[in-house]
Regions:
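Acidic, glycine/GT-rich loop-and beta-edge segments that sit at the periphery of enzyme/chaperone cores
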Residues: 2, 165, 284-337
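Conserved phosphate-binding catalytic cores of ATP/NTP-utilizing and phosphoryl-transfer enzymes
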Residues: 2-7, 75-122, 126, 228, ...
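Short glycine-rich, Thr/Ser-proximal phosphate-binding strand/loop in the N-terminal lobe
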Residues: 9-52, 129-137, 341-382
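Glycine-rich phosphate-binding loop of actin/hexokinase-like ATP-binding domains
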Residues: 36-39, 89-158, 253-259, 266-269, ...
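Short beta-strand-loop/turn "lid" adjacent to the catalytic site in phosphate-handling enzymes
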Residues: 38-42, 58-91, 116-120, 209, ...
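Glycine-rich phosphate-binding loop plus the immediately following alpha-helix
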Residues: 45, 129-182, 194, 199, ...
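Glycine-rich phosphate-binding loops at beta-strand->alpha-helix junctions
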Residues: 74-76, 222, 231-260, 269-274
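Adenine-nucleotide phosphate-binding core of ATP-dependent small-molecule kinases
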Residues: 198-229
Length: 388
């Protein structure tokens, strides 16, 4: 339902289109936040999610009541160019949004899906300038995407039968991952300078029998340690220090950072500061950039922005053996058998063969981050099945 015309052109909309999520803020002419969209993963379907978001905004506020729709974020520039609307660089947007929430903020820790950055702000009365900026390189170490991947690999929620990729499923996995890590009393030593070495470190710790909660906490502690050593380096951070971005929702990551910065602040709207900043900038410039849904549908965003997709692979000529344990086979008293066990980072397999290379028994199960415990269960399973 549209609002009355007397309230027309009252709202400025800011949308942060990141590598992982969409975040949206709506402000009124008094710079007050009137709406924040829930944190939403786009799974590469940016065009569809933007269309759904704009449709919802038009329905909620009325198309004619919106003065400006503006974009920021890693995918925001192409969208703005296609639609002919305002765009602001995400670093400036993040600072503007953070300063609106905490006007005296001096240091801004930003951690998103693919980027981590440090922004230091110098204040001169009512004015400010970006004193220094430092960001990660092309490696995904320390980013939200890498933590998502490790959560999916380690969290017990992954081993439910329902393995669909959805917002709810990933939220469930991350919640399980974080809650388990919060139980740790002593973080394991995980090197987080490189994603490859980090994963290798974690697998090695699993194989040593380290508690899973200690590995998870160690990952977050290592993440904070790597940020301090590589991004902060020898700089002294001025207070207040503000933590924003998708990873600022992660209670375990906040805990790890507070070991270095006890007064660290996670503000309200912490995942939407970029969206807030670009909405404020557009309002300040008195921009009047809008579009209708027809323009959005004609923009053909899919070809330029959405993640490229190929046809699903199909195994047409490959025969896969049954992954379930073989049927019980009783062994003769003097049968010599040979057991091979493959303990991987995600699955554990064994095969039992006789002297003629015939398969006697096999099994394939998820490692679940507990290689020793799972291997013990498999050995017990052999005894129960074969009476060996």
């Amino acid at each position: 339902m549209k609002m009355e015309k007397k309230n027309s052109k009252n709202y400025s909309v800011g949308i942060d289109v990141g590598s992982v999520s969409l975040n949206c803020i709506v402000i009124d002419k008094n710079r007050e936040i009137v709406f924040e969209s829930p944190y939403k993963r786009h799974f590469g379907k940016i065009d569809e999610e933007i269309l759904n978001l704009i449709e919802g905004l038009f329905e909620k506020f009325g198309e004619n009541n919106i003065q400006c729709i503006s974009f920021t974020g890693s995918h925001g520039k192409k969208l703005a160019e296609k639609l002919g609307v305002f765009y602001e660089f995400e670093t400036i947007s993040q600072v503007l949004g953070a300063l609106h929430l905490l006007p005296d903020a001096k240091s801004l820790i930003c951690m998103g899906g693919q980027d981590t950055a440090l922004l230091q702000i110098h204040h001169d009365g009512d004015k400010w300038e970006l004193e220094s900026f430092n960001a990660n390189g092309p490696c995904a170490s320390g980013t939200g995407s890498f933590l998502d991947q490790q959560a999916e690999r380690l969290a017990t929620a992954l081993y439910e039968k329902n393995k669909e990729t959805s917002q709810n499923q990933i939220d469930r996995i991350l919640n399980d991952f974080i809650c388990l890590g919060l139980k740790s009393g002593k973080p394991a030593n995980v090197a987080c300078r490189c994603t490859v070495f980090t994963k290798s470190d974690m697998i090695h710790l699993q194989n040593k029998g380290e508690k899973l909660e200690d590995i998870i906490y160690g990952l977050h502690v290592g993440n904070a340690r790597n940020y301090v050593s590589t991004i902060v380096s020898n700089q002294k951070l001025g207070d207040p220090i503000v933590f924003v971005g998708g990873l600022s929702k992660n209670e375990l990551q906040v805990k790890a950072f507070k070991a270095y910065y006890p007064d660290l602040i996670v503000p309200r709207h912490n995942t939407s500061t970029g969206a807030l900043g670009v909405a404020l900038k557009a309002l300040e410039l008195k921009r009047e950039d809008t579009f209708d849904l027809g323009d959005l549908k004609k923009a053909n965003l899919r070809g330029d922005i959405a993640v490229p997709k190929a046809p699903r692979l199909v195994l047409k000529k490959t025969e896969l053996p049954d992954a379930q344990p073989s049927r019980r086979k009783f062994l003769a008293i003097r049968t010599r058998a040979f057991l091979g066990i493959d303990i991987g980072s995600t699955t554990t397999k064994y095969a039992l063969i006789d002297e003629t290379h015939h398969l006697i028994h096999k099994s394939y199960v998820h490692t679940q981050g507990k290689p020793i415990e799972v291997t013990q269960k498999l050995l017990k399973h052999i005894v129960e099945e074969l009476g060996a």
